[in-house]
Amino acid sequence: MAKKLTIPLELKHDFSFKGYTKTMIGFLYVIREKFGAAAALECIDRLFNMEDRVKNLTNTLLTIFKIKGNDTEAILDFLNVWWELTEIEGTWPERSKTMSRIKITKCPWKTVYKDISDWALSWFNIVTKTINPKATVERPKGMCAGNPYCEYVFKLEE
């Protein structure tokens, strides 16, 4: 009988979620290259039913990781978890309860978002509104537009 392997949790994560992310990136890249940005956006919408799934994902991760609050710091706490899951890298140059700013310097989705980068902004908007319907997000800079990083600003009017 073969000896049972014990796979560390972090390695399981790398094989599952990160592998899934990379598979989806490749899939959407091929769709976009062969059929154009509109087809890639339609695939994203049909495959992911984005709004419902992102809301569900956000609420699930908020619960699992015990992220409390509904201010812009809670949004960044959520994004910190998300970045760990998806290999996104960046910094938080500004962080407060009413206004926070992030800079994404490494994004595995960058090649896919080349001409469908509004999808990323939509994703951030759904996450933001799920955490607090009164919060807003804007993207003053994006890598897909030739900038060295994506910048997102989260605001909560008092």
Where are these regions (language model features)?
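N-terminal accessory segment detector
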Residues: M1-M99, C107-W119, W123, K129-Y149, ...
